[in-house]
């Protein structure tokens, strides 16, 4: 019998695992090669057999494994009649001990990556202006304030592209994470542990479809705050899901075990129960390092285009 290498990556799926091996990826690639390419995007942290085994036998941490599914794809002229299935990351499988107790969707799995200090160096997209904020004139030079407010309040699917807008999605900013680092600190308050998570990121703006004037000193801090809020929302959403499932996939218990061994001996027997009410404070700081070659887009207002 051949022994499995402990460095091999593992995945879970919501259906039968055999379906993944029977997929026919495009360009004639082997399923295992296409699956490896999907995992290498690292949107969800990769886990090897060794890492899962260590989590299973360690105190204060539960394992998680990237979740992969199959999606249909459009048939092309280069591959007529080819099977229309391709691999896609759908999130992460959450374990409590050795039992799979739930799945985190992809959006929350991005927050999981931050909470285990493995933030993906990938492009994300946020809507501008942030929800609940107004659209000042300097924020959208191509849209008058009344038009921007009407766009924001319109029901989904009702927006129509305006002249010069083409097929692009309005009001979107896409940053690329260049560097990211997360620090964890614990302290004791009233005899109970509190975990503080400090996330720091340096971003590059790769697309500015909202037409923001990034040379304006008043605009860039608002954008950085919006990016930080987006990351924090994902982290808090993932934390809420993990608490509901009673699975400490972040290793907060192991952190307390290292920093406060005496307190850990009191909590270890019912750690999963205590984890659901563990106070966790999340702090996120984002700095935009580069804003791209076009800092002040040459965009006409829509009423000018109509004339």
In which residue ranges do the predicted regions lie?
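A glycine-rich, acidic short-motif signal
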Residues: 1-307
């Amino acid at each position: 019998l051949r022994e499995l290498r402990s460095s091999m990556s593992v995945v879970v799926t919501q259906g039968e695992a055999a379906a993944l091996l029977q997929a026919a990826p495009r360009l004639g690639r082997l399923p295992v090669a296409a699956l490896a390419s999907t995992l290498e995007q690292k949107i969800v942290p990769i886990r090897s057999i060794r890492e899962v085994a260590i989590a299973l036998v360690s105190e204060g941490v539960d394992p998680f494994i990237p979740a992969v599914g199959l999606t249909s794809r459009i048939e092309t002229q280069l591959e007529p009649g080819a099977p229309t299935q391709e691999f896609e990351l759908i999130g992460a499988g959450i374990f409590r001990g050795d039992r799979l107790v739930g799945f985190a969707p992809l959006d929350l799995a991005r927050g999981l990556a931050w909470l285990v200090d493995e933030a993906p160096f990938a492009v994300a997209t946020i809507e501008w202006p942030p929800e609940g904020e107004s659209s000042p004139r300097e924020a959208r030079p191509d849209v008058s304030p009344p038009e921007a407010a009407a766009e924001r309040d319109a029901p989904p699917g009702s927006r129509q592209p305006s002249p010069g807008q083409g097929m692009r999605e309005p009001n979107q900013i896409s940053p690329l994470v260049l560097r990211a680092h997360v620090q964890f600190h614990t302290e004791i308050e009233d005899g109970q542990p509190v975990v503080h998570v400090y996330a720091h990121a340096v971003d590059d703006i790769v697309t500015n479809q909202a037409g923001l004037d990034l040379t304006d000193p008043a605009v860039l801090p608002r954008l950085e705050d919006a990016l930080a809020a987006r990351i924090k929302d994902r982290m808090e959403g993932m934390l809420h899901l993990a608490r509901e499932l009673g699975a400490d996939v972040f290793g907060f218990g192991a952190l307390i075990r290292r920093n406060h061994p005496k307190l850990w001996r009191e909590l270890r027997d019912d750690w999963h129960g205590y984890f659901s009410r563990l106070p966790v404070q999340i702090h996120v700081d984002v700095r935009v390092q580069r804003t791209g070659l076009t800092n002040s887009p040459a965009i006409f207002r829509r009423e000018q285009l109509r004339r």
